[in-house]
Amino acid sequence: MGIQIDPHTLERAVERGTNEEEIKDVIQTGFSIPAKYGKLGKAKVYEFKKNRLNRYFEQKRVEVFYTIEGDRIVTITVYVFYGKWEEVA
């Protein structure tokens, strides 16, 4: 199944600290998370070990929300959270 990344998703990815490669990885290998309004969601935790906005974070959690339209996955948006989780990619 193909993945179509909406321009809105890419804009948010840049603002929030992720990229197209991670978005595709989350969809393909992430774990399912609850989503509203009939949408689907997946998340994945990555090692980060860097500063972001003048604070150090061990990990980041990337959450992607999407729909399935025919034979393709179409992204809606992406969220990125910084902190420390148990699950690591």
Positions of predicted regions on the chain:
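Ribonuclease/tRNase effector modules and their secretory precursors
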Residues: 1-89
